[in-house]
Structure formats: C-alpha cells, structure tokens
C-alpha cells in the first residue's frame, strides 16, 4: 500500500520538479528522540524549479543532467517526479526555501536537533552556497550551551561546525573530543572524517 501523500509547499508554483519527500522509517543515531508519528510518516510533496535545484545543489545538478534517467525524463516531458527518501521534510523545506531565494520563509532560529538535521542535509545535498549568514545565526544561541566534557553532543558539534565552516568552533570541539575520548569516537552515523574519529582507513 502506498504511503499517504501530504501536500507541502510550492516553492515554485510553476516548478517542473515534484519532490516526494519521505521521512526516515527508523530514528537516526544522532537524533534518537525524533520519532515520526503516523500523521508525519507520509510522503510530503513539494513543487520546485529544476533550474534553482541544479544551481544550488550539486546533488540535484547531477541527478537532473540529461545523461541520467531523471534528466532525460525531464527533457522529454517537461516535468518530473523525484523521490527523496529518508529525509526530514521540515528541514528539507527550509533548504528548498533557501534554494529558491524565499528568505522570508527561512527561520532565524532553530532547535539544536534541527540544526544537526540541517547540517546533515546540507552535507548530503551539497548546497552550502545558498546558506548565507543563516548558519551563524542558527549556531550562535547554542554555542554557550555546548558541553565542556566529551559526550555525544560533542560529536554533533564537530559535524555541525565542520559543515557550516565555523573553523574556531570546529577546532575547539575536535580538540575536546580527541583529548577526552578513551577510544574511537562514535560518529552517531554522521559522516565525520576518520582523522578525527581515530579509525584506520
């Protein structure tokens, strides 16, 4: 049986790409408390512009090239439906707003879990160039609350500061983790460099 489809936003009312975004079926290690209710578990539909997606995201640029099946279908039919699985729809909608220059819709503050989720999606969809000053605004309220002792939250800070290119913060939390961790650093399924985690290649 197909999952229920919920209508999301038209980030471009005349867009030629329909993005069918489905949330993760299981909690991720980096946000174990994030559970999707039956109401939230359905697919969310977003309308977007292939031009904006391709310019903003290396992931979509590759996926929409005419050499690929999706790109060929777009060229042939003038529109396409793309599945975007295992993706938090709310965070993805924020990135779509940034990609489509809808900055009035972008929040200036987010929860820490939302900050981590946004970093995960920015890293995956490779859309760093559309962020502007938003990461600094999102991070600033949480800096003073970060832990002084190594824990799982330290690992999240390593990832967030790395993705959002906060070099001073990255150096601080990375040194803390390397200095205080007694074994390999548990990455919580985040793509953190092996040079930091201590794992051999």
Which residues make up each language-model segment?
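N-terminal BTB/POZ boundary and linker segment
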Residues: 1-55, 98-113
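Acidic, serine/threonine- and proline-rich low-complexity regulatory tracts
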Residues: 9-15, 19-24, 29, 143-201
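Generic preference for well-ordered alpha-helical elements
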Residues: 12-14, 50-53, 57, 88-92, ...
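Short hydrophobic "helix-edge" motifs at membrane interfaces and signal-peptide entry regions
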Residues: 39-41, 115-117, 154-156
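Short amphipathic alpha-helical molecular recognition features
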Residues: 45, 52, 83-87, 107-110, ...
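Short hydrophobic alpha-helical segments that form membrane-spanning helices or hydrophobic packing faces
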Residues: 56-57, 130-137, 170-175
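Cytochrome P450 catalytic domain signature, combining two hallmark sequence patches
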Residues: 59-76
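Long, hydrophobic/aromatic-enriched structural stretches that serve as scaffold segments
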Residues: 75-138
């Amino acid at each position: 049986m197909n999952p229920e489809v919920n209508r999301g936003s038209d980030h471009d009312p005349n867009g030629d790409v329909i993005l069918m975004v489905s949330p993760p079926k299981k909690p991720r290690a980096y946000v174990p408390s994030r559970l999707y209710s039956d109401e939230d578990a359905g697919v969310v539909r977003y309308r977007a512009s292939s031009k904006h997606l391709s310019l903003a995201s290396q992931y979509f640029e590759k996926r929409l090239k005419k050499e690929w099946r999706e790109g060929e279908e777009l060229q042939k039919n003038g529109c396409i439906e793309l599945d975007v699985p295992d993706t938090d729809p709310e965070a993805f909608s924020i990135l779509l707003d940034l990609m489509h220059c809808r900055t009035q819709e972008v929040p200036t503050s987010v929860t820490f879990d939302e900050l981590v989720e946004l970093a995960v999606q920015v890293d995956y969809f490779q859309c760093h160039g559309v962020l502007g000053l938003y990461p600094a605004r999102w991070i600033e309220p949480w800096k003073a609350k970060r832990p002084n002792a190594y824990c799982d939250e330290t690992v999240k800070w390593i990832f967030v500061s790395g993705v959002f290119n906060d070099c001073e913060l990255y150096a601080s939390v990375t040194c803390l983790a390397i200095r205080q961790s007694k074994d390999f650093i548990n990455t919580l399924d985040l793509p953190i460099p092996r040079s930091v985690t201590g794992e051999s290649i």
